[in-house]
């Protein structure tokens, strides 16, 4: 087994050797909870969930940390705006909402979206506001080592001195003189306009609840500092992988790396970044109306179909959304579930699952493993999955039950790794009967998702009615359709 991942810092695909044998440590940036989740947030979470699942499948015990930024200029500004006279709330906004209530409410929306799409809960999910003492300690370390200073204007701000750290710009391979000023505070208090805030002194008019006492005056932490302090608490001063969206490379991750290493921490061994989501080749923008939210996707398709779509591209590539994207994903999921449903119909509830026993599908499984080992190449892995589905269908048609069973074994392994078996709302038990029922119902829901995406409402209603007659209740919600069995 040789795992290889692209490291942004070295700009090359390198062999992944965990710092501790048999274990892996991963920190990836969660959301700044200032609004509803957008597809970029969820695509990132799915990418690092796939990574976690694959590392686990490869026998590593993985510790995952995903932070919550619950104090931020934008959160405070949004809360303040909600108290203004004449405030006109947009969907999801509440008049007169305190910043901490706003942050918590949106945090719960993110958790709902993650859960609906089968994103595994991290080992730790720390909030920035719960780690102020750790942030104070890190700032003091940087001051003591000559890499940070209190602001020159008595504002209570504390800044990182970028000129004091010769490696600043290493992650993104930029020359410091070519960088723009850090737009996080009044530059009059800085030695250099590029210096960034570690601590922000309280400003007039800001709520007292958004301020903490510190040796430099009351205030709140800077965004970049928060992540460095939290990752060090939960994973130590050196860990395996730091992940996040491509848009976080600069300034966020550049600043994280600089301040952590300047404090004497080796920090991340690998930096991994996922690509953005576009709309028909263009950057999504509310101003031009070319956006689609996870909630809107879940109104059009089942959670597994949405997960398939958001997770199907290579994590480093751009994922482009088109009006037909969910239809295509639904058709792919329907092919997988169609094979599984036919296999259950043939074999009953006895799957005969034996991990490693794949018969004629062994080559496809080996191709799947090779793809995932090679910088998490999900497109190649999906090709191997669909090849196995085709082989399984052929075996069923030919009456080759042994090969069909082994193809089913392979499909179960692959879908487990990709998170495509995580069905929100299913009643899960350990019985084979429940597993068989889930496969059959999900095959029907995938067909229904295709019908809905094509606006074939009569076909969609017919599938729902058939399931209802069989004792399966389907409910359409903001997080997509869920199902349950009728109660006696």
Swiss-Prot record:
Binding annotation for ATP: 286
Assembly behavior: Monomer.
Family affiliation: Belongs to the class-I aminoacyl-tRNA synthetase family.
Co-factor requirement: Zn(2+)
Residues binding Zn(2+): 29, 227, 252, 256
Source organism superkingdom: Bacteria
Disulfide bonds: none
Gene name in the database record: cysS
Organism in which the protein naturally occurs: Pseudarthrobacter chlorophenolicus (strain ATCC 700700 / DSM 12829 / CIP 107037 / JCM 12360 / KCTC 9906 / NCIMB 13794 / A6) (Arthrobacter chlorophenolicus)
Group of enzyme by EC: ligase
GO molecular function: ATP binding; cysteine-tRNA ligase activity; zinc ion binding
Reactions accelerated catalytically: tRNA(Cys) + L-cysteine + ATP = L-cysteinyl-tRNA(Cys) + AMP + diphosphate
Protein name: Cysteine--tRNA ligase
